[in-house]
From Swiss-Prot:
Key words, A-Z: Amino-acid biosynthesis, Aromatic amino acid biosynthesis, FAD, Flavoprotein, FMN, Lyase, NADP
Pathway note: Metabolic intermediate biosynthesis; chorismate biosynthesis; chorismate from D-erythrose 4-phosphate and phosphoenolpyruvate: step 7/7
Protein name: Chorismate synthase
HAMAP family: Chorismate_synth (MF_00300)
Role summary: This reaction introduces a second double bond into the aromatic ring system.
GO cellular component, one term: cytosol
Organism (species): Methanopyrus kandleri (strain AV19 / DSM 6324 / JCM 9639 / NBRC 100938)
Amino acid sequence: MNTLGRLFRVTTWGESHGPALGAVVDGCPAGLPLSEDDVQRELDRRRPGQSGVSTPRSERDRVEILSGVHEGRTLGTPISMIVWNEDVDSSKYEPIRTRPRPGHADVTYRWKYGHVDYRGGGRASGRTTVGIVMGGAVAKKLLREAPSNDPLGIEIVGHVVRVGSVEADPGDLSAEEIMQYAESNPVRCADPDAAEEMLGEIERARENGDSVGGTIEVIAENVPPGLGDPVFGRLDGELAGALMNIPAVKAVEVGSGVRCSEMHGSEHNDPIWWDGHPVVDGDNSGGVLGGISHGGRLVVRVHVKPTPSVSVPQRTVDLESEEEVEIEVEGRHDPCICPRAVPVAESVVAIVLADAVLRAGYVNPDSVELPAASVEDRWRTLKRHL
């Protein structure tokens, strides 16, 4: 599957060393202000070669919007976007054509397809997240500015909270504060002291020809209540499943996550108070109860494995000779992918939420200028069942 979403659908395409990568967004309502600059801002945050902790591959990642937008507004038709690859060097990959790299999808793609594009990981490469970020840029715009008469104002921000053994403690910050601090350093960590230690951890891995993993936290503020469905359509389940589709992600937590197994119920339960309607206060639930959003801020954590491309000798096999061999991976790779994966994780959360607000009726699926339900309208209607 190359498509995420039901009403708001994002289809991505392209390979790491192909001529281009792209995305098609289908189901975005008409009337949403959208420009190439809106998408470019997000792509620039993901772009390679932007700091000493990322791959030296230098790509401008200049987006072109080919359809679905006229005079600066969406048409309600498919939005097609493209980014051309400009700095492709496939020479380092010929030696591994028949030697699957440990930790990569080389061997599993061979099992499934037989004929594969082995250059840079092909379709399995992190490079393909360009399409996710393009789709996420449209989703973020929708969540922030729709509907036109009463925008939801949903803000989504991510930051790195762990690299290797270094864990951040940014304290209780708003989404705006997290963005401000995280975007001020190359690690995208909102804790300045931890950011310095993380840089050291990444540099040590690079010097050893190795890599290091980490954890990204994504927070969404102003998420309305009622998103998601019971049992198999749970919002937290959809978020976890979608985030697990990001290359290198190995685990997802919602709210307190695995820490909840160490807690008592009296400690874990977030209290409820009244503000014209019931409000759940706290992050243990992560913004979701029973698979449905309760109106509090949404909190998820994404655990990212170390980049598998390392120059440390590793054991593999040669598929032609059928002999066991030793391999050292060459090429241009990130010693830690977490800083550039932050906008990718944000984008996936945005796409899932954009789909959910359309399904819940908070945004009219035809046009952002048409009437849609508000939180207050929803509560006035539903409380009649008390």
